[in-house]
Amino acid sequence: MGKQNSKLAPEVMEDLVKSTEFNEHELKQWYKGFLKDCPSGRLNLEEFQQLYVKFFPYGDASKFAQHAFRTFDKNGDGTIDFREFICALSITSRGSFEQKLNWAFNMYDLDGDGKITRVEMLEIIEAIYKMVGTVIMMKMNEDGLTPEQRVDKIFSKMDKNKDDQITLDEFKEAAKSDPSIVLLLQCDIQK
């Protein structure tokens, strides 16, 4: 597949203006940058991981990037096209609290079965710890929790029916009633 068109088709632009929180000018700028970094118009996992390494140079971002990639790659084809990229970016940067919770839930729900298990949550929490690096994690992690202890703390607050899995409803309800849970999920417990 060669070089992509340098402009979005009018119908695509119209759809993205409706589907995202970006205006036409912003979308044009993002598209230009996307094509500069990805001339093929698609971003594969390796390229995506390289982007994360730039943002998190003190840790190992590869595992977290895999999970973020899976969440961005809505159609599951192993690449992220501009639409998938800009829609995910819109949610994570400008979306409503509800949209961000749905996105986060999808990231933590590794197998896509609509429930987050302790194993799934531990996988993401460990990836976050690795990504931010030891020095930064020590500053963020004032309570000294290990990834396993953090998962236990999150489950004690979210898993209302104590069935060792968190549904989307439990996830949203707990996050809305206790904002500190959102900070735990991000592994950012600074007051």
Swiss-Prot record:
Q: Which CDD domains match?
A: EFh
Pfam family of the protein (one): EF-hand_1
Q: Does the keyword Isomerase apply?
A: no
Q: Which residues does the record give as Ca(2+) 2 binding sites?
A: 109, 111, 113, 115, 120
Entry GO CC: cytosol; membrane
Its Gene Ontology biological processes? negative regulation of insulin secretion; positive regulation of exocytosis; positive regulation of insulin secretion involved in cellular response to glucose stimulus; regulation of signal transduction
Coiled-coil stretches are none
Q: Domain EF-hand: where?
A: 40-58, 60-95, 96-131, 146-181
- Residues bound to Ca(2+) 3 are 159, 161, 163, 165, 170
| SUPFAM superfamilies, A to Z | EF-hand (SSF47473)
Give the residue range of the signal peptide. none
Q: Which Gene3D superfamilies match?
A: EF-hand
In alphabetical order, the GO MF annotations are: calcium ion binding
Function of the molecule: Regulates (in vitro) the inhibition of rhodopsin phosphorylation in a calcium-dependent manner.
Miscellaneous information on this protein: Probably binds three calcium ions.
Family classification = Belongs to the recoverin family.
Q: What is this protein called?
A: Visinin-like protein 1
